[in-house]
Each structure stands twice: as C-alpha cells, then as structure tokens.
A protein has these predicted regions:
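N-terminal secretory targeting modules
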Residues: 1-85, 137, 145, 214-219, ...
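Histidine-centered active-site loop/cap adjacent to the catalytic His
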Residues: 37-40, 234-270
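A cross-domain feature marking catalytic cores of carbohydrate-active enzymes
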Residues: 156, 185-186, 224
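Substrate-gating cap/lid alpha-helix
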Residues: 179, 188-223, 243-247
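Solvent-exposed, polar/charged alpha-helical surfaces in well-ordered, non-transmembrane soluble domains
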Residues: 65, 69, 138, 142, ...
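Active-site cleft segment of glycoside hydrolase catalytic domains centered on the general acid/base Glu
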Residues: 161-172, 192-202, 235-241
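Conserved SGNH/GDSL esterase-like catalytic core that processes O-acyl groups on lipids
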Residues: 38, 44-167
C-alpha cells in the first residue's frame, strides 16, 4: 500500500513523502494530489434505485454524487475508487460526465459479506448494459489492495446488525490499510423494516471500538451518521434514505473530510 498519510485534523490534508498534497480549501492547488476515496457499505452506499430496475434514475449515485458535488465546490481534487462502477444520472437522463462512479457499496451485504466478498445483487438493466450474467467482488483485503485508497468511508451493518462481524471488518481494514478509515454509525430505520429497533444497540458499541483502535495507534475516526438523520429522512421501506437523507449523509462525510477552519475567539489577537 502506498504511503500517502493524509491527516484530517485541520483544513489541510498533508501527505508524508510528498512535497504537497492538498492546499487549504479555496487556495491554489498547482501541486495538489488527487485524494482516492473508497466508499464501503451496502445499498445505501451504492445508491438505491428508487425506480426499481428502470435506469436512468436521478438518485442512482445516492450520497456519493452529492458528496462529490461538495468536494468539487470546495476545490478538493478527488477520485472515488472501488470494485463497482454504477453511474449517477441527471434528471434529464444523461450520464453526468463529472461523476466519479466507482465505489464498494454491496447491496444486501452484511458485514460478513463485505469482509468475504461474493456475488452482488445487481439491477437487470446494469447487467444488460455490462453484458454480464453476474457481478462478483473480492473480499475487503483484496479490494483494498486493488483499489489503493487514501481514505475509506465505511458505513455498514444495516443488513443483519452483526456488531461482532463489524468489529472483525474494522480490524481487518486496519490491519491491511495504512490510510485513514472513517467509520460511521448506521442511519435510522423504522417500520416496516424488520429489526429496525436493533439499530440503536448496534450503533452503541461503535464509539468504544473506534476509541480502542485509536489508542492502538490506528488512523480511524467516527462519524455519527445516526444523529445526522431522523426517521423522516428515511423512505417508506424503512431503511433507505430519501433525497433529504442523502444530502445529510453527504454533509456529514464532507465535514469529516474537510473540517472547518478554526474560528478565532471573540477578543482574541489575530
């Protein structure tokens, strides 16, 4: 894995072993290095096809499209990476040429599934467009090695709520990845989603897991995505975010990637 040790403690993203990775937001970027971001998760990461199997769909890129819009507006050079490449579509049905389509959002997969890989449930229109019978992805270790991300955005567990498998997934990523891991609690769920009441206890153990890895020197941080959304931000299926929810997810990831500059205290010497 490449040594591009990005640090997200201020408005700067710095890489050891490179002269300059990314100038502060809004500054010239003549020597900026493109940040390789790998979104890892389930159908919420992939982007739900709310129109069933009919493509194109305006929400095809989910929160990934929205996050990319924010990063681009902030002047952050980036590339999304992952084993899948479902595109985002504009309202007029034309592929958005600025969209970076790759991701590792494995629809229907549990934490264990993401860890091990397998056949990904894929809309028929996507299979037809690709001319394949199925889409298969490797386990997370091989996926990391193949895609070489600088940052992993992990939000998983909505399928199965298996905290022990999540812990193994996080441990595996930390053991095979020297970049920055940003892990999120899962978003709220509601009826008629089966098991929606398990979301809170599943999320409750995540801060402790992150803290333990931080104390061990791992480069891992937490985003509280559950607190960022409300049940009103979830569609009638009880699990997938609606347009407002997707915006909030993108905002939360953006704040994690591009922290605000510290504001001077009133009366402080400038």
């Amino acid at each position: 894995m490449r040594k591009r040790a990005f640090i997200f403690g201020s408005a700067w993203l710095v890489a050891a072993s490179l002269p300059l990775v990314l100038m502060a937001v809004g500054q010239p970027q003549e020597h900026a290095v493109t940040l390789r971001i790998m979104p890892v998760g389930d159908s919420i990461t992939r982007g739900t096809y709310l129109g069933g199997e009919t493509l194109p769909n305006p929400l095809g890129g989910g929160w990934r499209k929205r996050l990319q819009d924010r990063l681009r507006a902030a002047g952050v050079p980036f590339e999304f990476v992952g084993e899948l490449d479902y595109w985002a579509y504009g309202a007029d049905g034309v592929v958005d040429p600025s969209f970076s389509p790759r991701h590792h959002g494995l629809a229907g997969f549990s934490n264990e599934g993401i860890l091990k890989g397998g056949v990904v449930p894929t809309p028929k229109a996507v299979l037809a467009a690709k001319g394949v019978q199925e889409v298969r992805v490797p386990g997370i270790v091989e996926a990391l090695a193949r895609n070489k991300p600088d940052v992993v955005l992990l939000m998983s567990g909505a399928n199965g709520f298996d905290a022990s498998a999540r812990d193994r997934l996080v441990e595996t990523i930390c053991a095979h990845f020297d970049g920055e891991l940003v892990v999120a609690t899962i978003t709220p769920q509601k009826a008629p989603r089966r098991g929606w009441e398990l979301v809170v206890p599943y999320n409750a153990s995540l801060p402790g897991l992150v803290e333990r890895h931080q104390k061990e020197g791992r480069r891992i941080r937490l985003v509280d995505m559950y607190a960022a959304l409300t049940p009103d931000d979830i569609t009638k299926d009880g699990v997938h975010p609606n347009a407002a929810g997707l915006d909030k997810i993108a905002d939360a990831w953006f704040r994690a990637l591009v922290p605000e500059k510290p504001r001077p205290r009133v009366g402080a010497i400038r």
